[in-house]
Amino acid sequence: MDAQSVAPVVLVILDGWGYREAPEGNAVLAARTPVVDSLWATYPHTLLQASGRAVGLPSGQMGNSEVGHLTLGAGRVVPQELVRISDAIETGSLFHEPLLVEVCHRLKEQGGRFHFIGLCSEGGVHSHIDHLYGLLKLAAQAGIPAYVHAITDGRDTLPRDGARVLAALEKELQWLGSGVIATLSGRYYAMDRDRRWERTQKAYEILTEDGPGCGRSAAEVMEDFYAQDITDEFIPPTRLAPGAVQSGDAVIFFNFRPDRARQLTQAFVCPDFSGFQRRLIPDLTFITMTQYDPTLPVQVLFKPQNLDHLLGQVVSEAGLKQLRIAETEKYAHVTYFFNGGIEQPFPGEDRILVQSPLVATYDQMPEMSAVEVTDKAIEAIARREYSLVVLNYANPDMVGHTGNFKATVRALETVDRCLGRLLAAVVDVGGTTLIVADHGNAELMWDEQGNPWTAHTNNPVPCILVEGERRKIPGRGGDVKLRSGGTLADVGPTLLEILGLPQPPEMTGQSLLQPAEYTILQRQPAPVGR
């Protein structure tokens, strides 16, 4: 195919832009978004389910960016790690896992200790507190001392939920008769993913440098921070009790989502680590709940699921070029997660990374790097060499997580303006744009009591098809509607149909494009008397 003849299909992911009709706390409705409003009124559109069983999560579990992008790229419902791990604990199979049996035996013989590091949260996005409870039960049954290094959430949960969660954890430890919460650290420090190494360093040092601790309960310490208006996400690394990670110990990082667990893991295990000066702990067994990065020298409890015939793979095997573009905060999502947990690009897949602004929180700069992402995408689209472009706008989600309503409105308005520019560029080359979101967030900024809601939601997400003049979808006659009842798993098959590529049997989602004959039938006059 001549490069000049390519009319691209562009998938635009509005991260965290959910759909909700109630106006209270709804930044999406409060924002001036003439582009999206016009598209919704003019072009084929529908709502998609992006949470719970529709994306491989437990019923009622809110969606998230990792799961959303994985489902979009896989074109099928993929059982998520949250479910896999919970099932292993519930059935007891986790306790017979050969890796854990061997580590328990060695620690028992050599007098080593367990350290459980992870996000102590019921959010279910990066971890789940029930998984920690399962690991603590394992340690107690084996008679091995256990130290919990609790990372506090406040981003996928309410900002001050941590005290309640940690109080419940302390009761669980009392019931088990073993284990102690040794350290606290807000995810702002322990789960940075933007190479702000000074944050990671503070978390690492509290984990590896011992001290007497403050001798107070975790819940009491959390309440003191709340009194200073420091919420869960921003809890400074704090030692509660002696129990630093030492030589001969074993660490289990129980986060199942990789992106925000990598930097801290690298500090523990990489011999050539250069993020900051650190003391490397020798003879340390380091286990991650899932595979964070295939290059990390760690042991993995739950190996990756082998997904075949993903959207990017099908496009690549058809000999077509594709582009993935996002700013730092969502770059892993349009690459690693969209490709089913594969870091390596497919042949013909190019990637553009735009640096996210270096600010403490994104409400300080709601525009983030959306303009730069748009500029680079427009340049790439104008070259007419990419059959598929996958682009993410991070603003609605990342600013929505701050709980700042006015800033989130600005973020949405920024994305709307950028989307208008992007669409004009796609139209210029006769391309087609499919606009979706991966989960809800910005449409719910406070709860029924008026408290800030910084987590995701279970709300459906919009999906809009903007068909290019020079691209007529095969078999659709250029007159297309989008069916209702769809999920994120249906987006991949939809894109393949627009591209004119066959859908592999592994993709069990169904195209959202309604059959042309159904559309025609719908326009027939109703019989008299009905």
Curated annotation (Swiss-Prot):
Its EC number is 5.4.2.12. It catalyses: (2R)-2-phosphoglycerate = (2R)-3-phosphoglycerate. GO terms for molecular function: manganese ion binding; phosphoglycerate mutase activity. Pathway: Carbohydrate degradation; glycolysis; pyruvate from D-glyceraldehyde 3-phosphate: step 3/5. SUPFAM superfamilies: 2,3-Bisphosphoglycerate-independent phosphoglycerate mutase, substrate-binding domain, Alkaline phosphatase-like. Its cofactor is Mn(2+). Mn(2+) 2 binds at residues 15, 65, 438-439. It comes from the Bacteria. GO terms for cellular component: cytosol. CDD domains: iPGM. Binds 2 manganese ions per subunit. Keywords: Glycolysis, Isomerase, Manganese, Metal-binding. Pfam families: iPGM_N, Metalloenzyme. Belongs to the BPG-independent phosphoglycerate mutase family. HAMAP family: GpmI. NCBIfam families: pgm_bpd_ind (TIGR01307). This is 2,3-bisphosphoglycerate-independent phosphoglycerate mutase. It comes from Synechococcus sp. (strain JA-3-3Ab) (Cyanobacteria bacterium Yellowstone A-Prime).
